[in-house]
């Protein structure tokens, strides 16, 4: 049975956007001073973005966050490409209000270039966004995900959505929901993370649900 969601804003993950994102760790290194970063941001057609603190809006309209000062040419940085924002329903809210002022935050995401939205919607609409992104990943990498597992409440608020895991020789690529880590902590990103494999031990087997949850959390939580 579909699970209700207050609102969803999203922008399709394309091959070009994915290519640019996956190339960041091996791109020419850009110094982490403001002048050098501003120059690289302008050269790429990016902009600084306030929806997530210290983030960028790429030329494809997605929001890119990193745990370092620069995402350019830093192989050990963890980077996150946000292509969807979910405002989940809180089933514990007896009046089902859930802080309706958060609609305005989702509106800001929906106003980004190339983004669209739906309200109300369901977890199935969110899964459709993730499935489209997964097809792009499969087309780009030439193979499907190594692991597919439902998300847990420890990783993201809202209904359980699908996490998919790929690996390159150096990085883990995790596609799925993640906490927005914003000032309210209630919205959920739909994102692709690119993080060094060293963030967690070897990928657990498919039947080790608890181990996979810990492994994914080590890569997507920041």
Regions found by a protein language model. Give the residues of each.
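Short helix/turn-capping signatures at newly exposed starts of structured segments
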Residues: 1-151, 156-159, 179-222
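Short, isolated positions in well-ordered beta-strands
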Residues: 173-174
């Amino acid at each position: 049975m579909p699970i209700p969601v207050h609102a969803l804003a999203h922008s399709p993950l394309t091959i070009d956007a994915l290519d640019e994102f996956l190339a960041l760790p091996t791109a020419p290194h850009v110094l982490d001073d403001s002048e050098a970063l501003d120059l690289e941001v302008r050269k790429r057609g990016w902009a600084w973005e306030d929806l997530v603190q210290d983030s960028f809006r790429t030329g494809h309209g997605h929001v890119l966050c990193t745990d370092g000062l620069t995402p350019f040419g830093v192989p050990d940085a963890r980077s996150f490409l946000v292509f969807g924002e979910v405002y989940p329903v809180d089933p514990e809210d007896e009046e089902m209000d859930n802080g309706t002022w958060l609609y305005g935050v989702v509106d800001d995401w929906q106003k980004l270039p190339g983004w669209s939205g739906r309200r109300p919607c369901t977890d199935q609409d969110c899964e459709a966004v993730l499935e489209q992104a997964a097809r792009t990943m499969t087309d780009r990498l030439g193979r499907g995900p190594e692991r597919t597992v439902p998300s847990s409440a420890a990783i993201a608020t809202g209904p359980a959505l699908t996490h998919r895991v790929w690996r390159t020789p150096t990085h883990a690529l995790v596609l799925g929901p993640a906490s927005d880590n914003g000032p309210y902590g209630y919205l959920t990103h739909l994102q692709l993370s690119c993080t060094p494999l060293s963030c967690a031990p070897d990928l657990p087997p498919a039947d080790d649900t608890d181990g996979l949850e810990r492994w994914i959390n080590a890569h997507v939580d920041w």
